[in-house]
């Protein structure tokens, strides 16, 4: 890509020529895994208080027939995408790209399934749009690295808005010029501050759904003739200027070999329902729990990457004593303490009961960190902990990769088992769930995506 080329124009040209049959089988398999996992994560949140809030507000805006996953009643297209995306991201159990901290599944899947229902899209077109959306979002994330977080914003929301717009534009078969307008419109919808880290409030959950519905809205506006700025990504007042570290970026990452090389193949299916970078430390603690007596632990020191500190470690006293269950998911010390005491970590681990458990809190307050300047985050997700016992002995535990990631992926049976476990938190019939699994893994064979959507009720 030359310095004179406009990023959105080049990207639109590349997206517009991608054919479903040219997407490699490995990417197709990953997209199917992400789709099933995303829906399962949304079903796990179906009976939550935040879902009730979302349903109540959508009913105030009128009715619709776009499916809300796990419920009989539907909603308008924007509310359905908002609810499904928010629910899917709600317990932080959703897939995450290994290489930068973005969650494409919970943005792209609800956007495309909602828009696909409205347009009666085929399974092939759905697969194409999903794959494009995942790829755009992961490539955008690789450009920004950790800078969006450092500026105080949530990359899943900011970058997801752009990616869902490209995915929806692909599903609508917009012309390149219309895609450029759609991206320009979407750029004004990018948002999502990370102040939720201070008190565990629900807004992080909302970010995925907001990005999903924004992509639908921006692409439909462009289709109807609305315009947006051409240099919305790389302009002097564009997205990267506003949300990252300026316009001097390597935009080649976004466009080089696009449609030929699919980096989103490295999307990880989460093994634990907590912030992604807590996972290697959880695995260290699961190892340690087999060997140590917690009553003999004086302190635990963790080697960490600097880019994770402001989200998962600081303020340390708050992270050691999280104010609610949601805040606990983004506390490495508390997640580690849960793993040490329970010898496992699942959705049931994050409850008021354990949040007030004195022994778990005592252990969490023994856990501290030191920055390792050689930690490869965000390129690799690793962990090393040093457990100092009252005898003076120090035991070391390490994890060299992310469970569920490219070096240790979950198998298809494991992904299905995770989906089935998440299903137990919803009211979806088992017969519908089994049909859904079959439909997702044969997605490109569906003549109409509404066949799949009917199984979601």
Question: At which residue positions do the language-model features occur?
Answer:
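Short acidic/histidine-centered micro-motifs embedded in hydrophobic/aromatic stretches
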Residues: 57, 129-133, 182-189, 303, ...
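Structural helix-adjacent loops and short alpha-helical linkers that scaffold large soluble proteins
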Residues: 118-130, 173-180, 228-231, 293, ...
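Hydrophobic alpha-helical hairpins/lids featuring a short glycine-rich hinge
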Residues: 87-147
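Hydrophobic face of alpha-helices
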Residues: 28, 32, 36, 108, ...
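Buried hydrophobic packing segments
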Residues: 39, 108-115, 130-140, 161-172, ...
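Terminal-appendage/accessory-domain detector
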Residues: 1-101, 203-213, 220-457
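Amphipathic alpha-helical interface segments
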Residues: 107-110, 152-161, 165-171, 181-253
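Secretory-pathway/luminal and periplasmic proteins that interact with or process carbohydrate-rich
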Residues: 62-64, 136-144, 189-196, 309-311
